[in-house]
Regions:
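C-terminal scaffold of the Radical SAM
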Residues: 1-158
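Generic alpha-helical secondary structure signal
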Residues: 31, 111, 162-166, 192
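Short amphipathic alpha-helical interaction segments
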Residues: 158-173
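A short, conserved structural fragment
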Residues: 172-182
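Minor-groove-contacting beta-hairpin "wing" of winged helix-turn-helix DNA-binding domains
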Residues: 183-187
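Short, amphipathic alpha-helical interaction segments positioned at domain boundaries
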Residues: 189-197
């Protein structure tokens, strides 16, 4: 009833992913990747699927689509979900945990990960506790990714947020977003660039 249609991520620097044999010349260009996505999107829409957020599609009766309509759609590290997840525990090497107020990443090699687990240690290598500004930015990013719009509270602003607003002016000129006061809406034309917004 739902599927994720992700673009290939070329990460040859990550050990063990088997991508070292490819180089940039073996891969489709950004324009070719976009065409592939648009062709796939068209085929999925012909089968009755509706685009939900970025890279996700669902049938109309699926609760993922219903949560989009009801403005309850949420996104976490795994993709879009119909329920707000405030705790995700990452299991395995390099996995990322998210407690809403903090992120933690596990050690990146199998050997070190296994050793720490066998010794009863938590295999976290790094983390970040979100401050109030981080949480504000996170909320706006989620609003844009899930609802294609967000409204900034002028009483809860800070310089970086105002700078982001200025950077969006070029996207507004390209008709990718509409800005009305402190409200940003991603246009249909801009939907393909949601990650960039």
């Amino acid at each position: 009833d739902r599927l994720a249609f992700y673009s290939y991520a070329h990460v040859p620097w990550v050990k063990g992913v088997g991508q070292r044999g490819f180089d940039e010349n073996d891969l489709p260009s950004g324009e070719e990747k976009r065409r592939l996505y648009e062709d796939g999107k068209k085929l999925l829409e012909e089968l009755g699927y509706i685009e939900v957020g970025m890279d996700h599609f669902s049938l109309e009766h699926d609760d993922l689509y219903q949560s989009l309509i009801q403005k309850k759609l949420h996104r976490n590290f795994m993709g879009y979900t119909s329920s707000k997840t405030q705790l995700m525990v990452g299991l395995g090497m390099s996995a990322i945990s998210d407690s809403w107020y903090a992120f933690a990443q596990n050690i990146k090699t199998v050997e070190e990960y296994q050793k720490m687990v066998e010794e009863g240690e938590i295999p976290v290598v790094k983390g970040h506790i979100l401050n109030d500004e981080d949480l504000t930015v996170r909320r706006h990013i989620l609003n844009l990714m899930c609802q294609l719009e967000t409204t900034f509270d002028i009483h809860n602003s800070f310089p970086e947020l105002e700078n982001a607003f200025e950077m969006l002016k070029e996207m507004e000129n390209d008709e990718l977003v509409e800005i009305n006061g402190h409200h940003i809406h991603i246009t249909e034309k801009g939907r393909a660039f949601t990650r960039n917004v």
